[in-house]
């Protein structure tokens, strides 16, 4: 069953078709590379086909944030409502081959929808996700005890250089300015972050926010001063404000902060935050990842999904 279209749904920047399925905004100019890369080709009855371009690869497979973006796009398409929460389990590491994406509206209530998403490859599950979607009705009780991280201004933040041959390909899709915490490999802080935007300016929406929660170099690199494989086991994303945030333009960067506190037997957590330049919290994330020694020249396999049962 599809939820009815409502003013609350449309108020969050989604165009909703008459049957409740999210309609893509009309194309009035060139398609942004991110939209082209994360496009879902309809395959009928809540199913789509997708591909993972080489520029989103981490080693042999796509970046976990890219896969999260596909899941976010499918969940919104199936429900016709804006994403509020997305929990992803990376059960295997897909290759660059075509992907099959499916979404099922498990429940559509008056205000919220629950959607399950599967990303498969050659009939085998790669990512299992569950999404909560809802508009933001007027009259909700609000409070804000958040505090924006202290960071260097954008103009004073050095560009993160990505010329090294082993840098994961997907990081070239972003303009990254280091502004807080430790640089990767510094062993000076248990947090890292800075200003982040797509290389070509683009307004924030749920798929892009999902991708950004897994875009920065792992906080573990700043905490340990070492580089190692850091595949993601699971990732949870909470979207805290309407998208795009009022007052933000496509040219604006978001401030990101990622931190870690504990690794036991190579299993570690990372907490993430995305902020507007004006100091409003946009989204929060937490992921559980692995820290694995592997002879390599660089951080080439960072930020990929865990391999699951796939042979190395």
PLM segments and residue spans:
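Terminal targeting signals and extreme-terminal segments of soluble enzymes
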Residues: 2-4, 10-312
């Amino acid at each position: 069953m599809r939820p009815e279209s409502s003013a609350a749904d449309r108020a969050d920047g989604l165009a909703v078709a008459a049957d409740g399925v999210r309609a893509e905004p009309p194309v009035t100019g060139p398609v942004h590379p991110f939209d082209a890369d994360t496009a879902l080709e309809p395959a009928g009855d809540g199913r789509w086909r997708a591909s993972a371009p080489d520029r989103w690869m981490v080693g042999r497979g796509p970046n976990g944030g890219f896969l999260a973006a596909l899941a976010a796009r499918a969940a919104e398409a199936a429900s016709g409502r804006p994403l509020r929460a997305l929990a992803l389990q990376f059960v295997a590491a897909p290759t660059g081959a075509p992907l099959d994406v499916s979404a099922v509206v498990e429940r559509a209530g008056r205000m919220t929808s629950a959607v399950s998403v599967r990303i498969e490859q050659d009939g085998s599950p790669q990512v299992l996700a569950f999404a909560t979607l809802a508009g933001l009705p007027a009259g909700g009780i609000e409070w804000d005890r958040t505090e924006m991280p202290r960071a260097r201004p954008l103009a004073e933040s050095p560009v993160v250089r990505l010329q090294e041959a082993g840098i994961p390909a997907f990081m070239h899709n972003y303009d990254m300015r280091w502004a807080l915490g430790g640089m990767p490999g510094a062993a000076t802080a248990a947090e890292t972050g800075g200003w982040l935007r797509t290389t070509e300016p683009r307004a924030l929406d749920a798929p892009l926010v999902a991708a950004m929660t897994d875009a920065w170099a792992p906080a573990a690199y700043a905490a340990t001063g070492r580089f190692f494989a850091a595949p993601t086991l699971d990732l949870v994303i909470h979207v805290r404000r309407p998208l795009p945030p009022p007052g933000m333009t496509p040219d604006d960067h978001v401030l990101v902060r990622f931190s870690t506190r504990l690794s036991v037997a190579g299993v570690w957590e990372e907490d993430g935050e995305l902020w507007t330049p004006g100091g409003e919290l946009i989204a929060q994330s937490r992921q559980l990842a692995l820290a694995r020694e592997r002879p390599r020249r660089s951080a080439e396999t960072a930020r990929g999904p865990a391999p699951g049962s796939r042979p190395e």
